[in-house]
């Protein structure tokens, strides 16, 4: 606070004054402060405390304090303890203005002061509420994470299955490849064998042909040609006979 | 205990003890010390709010050097407002009607602003004596006029004294005239008195504010 700052700085540079830093040093000043009352003391007609009326009620009843007030006023005026002079009128005027001002603007000012305090409380309350909601949210999130963590076995199984499938696929691919390679080798062997057989066959056929051709003597050739001619003549005769028939 | 017109302006003494000291220091008890609580009662809340707002508004046009004067100006304002408003109550003495008090406040503070200006930025402080854009032939005359204006600034105190004294005196006169009057005419006079009362309340607050405002203005020029 500004005033406190001035006082403290003053105490630093003027040591001959009261050492203000020696005040409020005992632990008594740190004791918890009792709560403030909600409302101020009850008053009647704005100024006179209700307690006076309660005090006088047993002896003088309800009108007691009023009689006291009126009697006091009369006494003061008649004994000229208080003289009515120009200040009285000025006081009456000023009193009217003050009472009017307080009655008219009092509740508004009080509401304003209450609003200032209320805003202070509300700001702190907002912080507190925000902290509470965020913490509650954090608790929910944590619970969700714990629930999620429970399913970790399923996750591991799925992953394990995945890996097993991959391995199986790989194995089958390799088996397939091996089969293909073996088949290729065997096909080669078969092709080789057929080639061999064909070549042998061709060779043999060639050899037989060659031998047959070389074994045909010129005698055989003549006899065969003569036979062919006679066969042809017979055939021609038959044909001529068929044609004339 | 008859009162004359000017009794209200006599500096009160009792058995040789100048009671003006009491009149100057007792109003302090009307301002409760802010407590160590977080939420206070209405009086302390309003007081704190008012002081904060006032200081903030007052320090807006001042640069950082002028902020050193914050405590002084705010406490001066509270002091003057309290003295003025309490003086409106009947049978009270208003210390601010004494020229000695007001000049005692105004002259040192004004002189402080002048000396600060002359020490820290003498060129700018002297430059204030000649407003911008004056035609050349007018310069000598204007410098003299501005110097006179500078030295008449302690009239801050005279202004406060005059306003308050006049107001109180008017109320006293109107009330005095009201005393032996016939009721029909008295009604008019009481209306006058009522209006004067309202005016006085306003003047009490305004004059205190003007005092502090002008001081801050002088500070703004020089700091």
Swiss-Prot record, chain B:
Membrane topology per the record? Multi-pass membrane protein
The entry sums up its family as follows:
Belongs to the ATPase A chain family.
Q: Which reaction does it catalyse?
A: H(+)(in) = H(+)(out)
Spell out the PANTHER family in the cross-references: ATP SYNTHASE SUBUNIT A
Note the SUPFAM superfamilies from the entry. F1F0 ATP synthase subunit A
Location(s), subcellular = Mitochondrion inner membrane
Asked whether the keyword Endoplasmic reticulum is assigned, the reply is no
Transmembrane spans: 12-32, 69-89, 98-118, 132-152, 165-185, 197-219
Q: Which GO terms describe its cellular component?
A: mitochondrial inner membrane; proton-transporting ATP synthase complex
Q: Name one GO biological process term.
A: proton motive force-driven ATP synthesis
The record's section on Gene3D superfamilies has: ATP synthase, F0 complex, subunit A
Its function, per the record, reads: Subunit a, of the mitochondrial membrane ATP synthase complex (F(1)F(0) ATP synthase or Complex V) that produces ATP from ADP in the presence of a proton gradient across the membrane which is generated by electron transport complexes of the respiratory chain. ATP synthase complex consist of a soluble F(1) head domain - the catalytic core - and a membrane F(1) domain - the membrane proton channel. These two domains are linked by a central stalk rotating inside the F(1) region and a stationary peripheral stalk.
Record text on subunit structure and interactions: Component of the ATP synthase complex composed at least of ATP5F1A/subunit alpha, ATP5F1B/subunit beta, ATP5MC1/subunit c (homooctomer), MT-ATP6/subunit a, MT-ATP8/subunit 8, ATP5ME/subunit e, ATP5MF/subunit f, ATP5MG/subunit g, ATP5MK/subunit k, ATP5MJ/subunit j, ATP5F1C/subunit gamma, ATP5F1D/subunit delta, ATP5F1E/subunit epsilon, ATP5PF/subunit F6, ATP5PB/subunit b, ATP5PD/subunit d, ATP5PO/subunit OSCP.
Q: Which UniProt keywords apply?
A: ATP synthesis, CF(0), Hydrogen ion transport, Ion transport, Membrane, Mitochondrion, Mitochondrion inner membrane, Transmembrane, Transmembrane helix, Transport
InterPro entries (alphabetical): ATP_synth_F0_asu (IPR000568), ATP_synth_F0_asu_AS (IPR023011), ATP_synth_F0_asu_bact/mt (IPR045083), F0_ATP_A_sf (IPR035908)
For this protein, the record's NCBIfam families field holds: ATP_synt_6_or_A (TIGR01131)
The domain of life is Eukaryota
Query: Pfam families, from UniProt?
Result: ATP-synt_A (PF00119)
Q: Does the keyword Repeat apply?
A: no
Name by which UniProt lists this protein: ATP synthase F(0) complex subunit a
According to the UniProt entry, its GO molecular function terms are: proton channel activity; proton-transporting ATP synthase activity, rotational mechanism
- According to its UniProt entry, this protein's organism is Oncorhynchus mykiss
């Amino acid at each position: 606070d500004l005033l406190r700052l001035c006082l403290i700085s003053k105490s630093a540079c003027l040591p001959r004054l009261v050492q203000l830093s020696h005040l409020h040093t005992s632990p008594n000043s740190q004791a918890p402060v009792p709560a403030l009352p909600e409302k101020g003391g009850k008053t009647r007609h704005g100024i006179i405390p209700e307690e006076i009326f309660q005090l006088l009620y047993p002896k003088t009843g309800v009108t007691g304090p009023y009689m006291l007030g009126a009697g006091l006023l009369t006494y003061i005026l008649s004994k000229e303890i208080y003289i009515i002079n120009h200040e009285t009128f000025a006081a009456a005027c000023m009193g009217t203005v003050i009472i009017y001002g307080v009655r008219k603007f009092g509740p508004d000012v009080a509401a304003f002061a209450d609003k200032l305090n209320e805003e202070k409380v509300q700001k702190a309350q907002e912080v507190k509420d925000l902290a509470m909601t965020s913490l509650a949210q954090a608790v929910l999130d944590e619970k969700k994470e714990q629930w999620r963590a429970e399913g970790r076995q399923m996750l591991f199984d799925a992953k394990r299955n995945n890996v097993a499938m991959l391995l199986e696929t790989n194995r089958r691919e390799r088996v397939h490849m091996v089969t293909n390679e073996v088949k290729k080798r065997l096909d080669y062997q078969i092709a080789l064998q057929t080639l061999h057989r064909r070549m042998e066959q061709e060779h043999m056929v060639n050899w037989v042909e060659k031998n047959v051709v070389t074994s045909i003597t010129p005698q055989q050739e003549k006899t065969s040609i003569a036979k062919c001619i006679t066969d042809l003549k017979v055939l021609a005769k038959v044909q001529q006979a068929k044609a004339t028939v | 205990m008859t009162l004359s017109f000017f009794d209200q302006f006599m500096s009160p003494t009792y058995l040789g003890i100048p009671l003006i000291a009491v009149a100057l220091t007792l109003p302090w008890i009307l301002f409760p010390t802010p407590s160590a609580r977080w939420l206070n009662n209405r009086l302390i809340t309003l007081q704190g709010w008012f002081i904060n707002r006032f200081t903030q508004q007052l320090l807006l046009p001042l640069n950082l050097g002028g902020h050193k004067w914050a405590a002084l100006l705010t406490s001066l304002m509270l002091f003057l407002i309290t003295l003025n408003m309490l003086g409106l109550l009947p049978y009270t003495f208003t210390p601010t009607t004494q020229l000695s008090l007001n000049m005692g406040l105004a002259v040192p503070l004004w002189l402080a602003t002048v000396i600060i200006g002359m020490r820290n930025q003498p060129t700018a402080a002297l430059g204030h004596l000649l407003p911008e854009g004056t035609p050349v032939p007018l310069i000598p005359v204007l410098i003299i006029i501005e110097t006179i204006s500078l030295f008449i600034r302690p009239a801050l105190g005279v202004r406060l004294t005059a306003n308050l004294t006049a107001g109180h005196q008017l109320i006293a006169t109107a009330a005095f005239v009201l005393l032996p009057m016939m009721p029909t005419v008295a009604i008019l006079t009481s209306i006058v008195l009522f209006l004067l009362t309202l005016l006085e309340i306003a003047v009490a607050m305004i004059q205190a504010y003007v005092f502090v405002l002008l001081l801050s203005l002088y500070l703004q020029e020089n700091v």
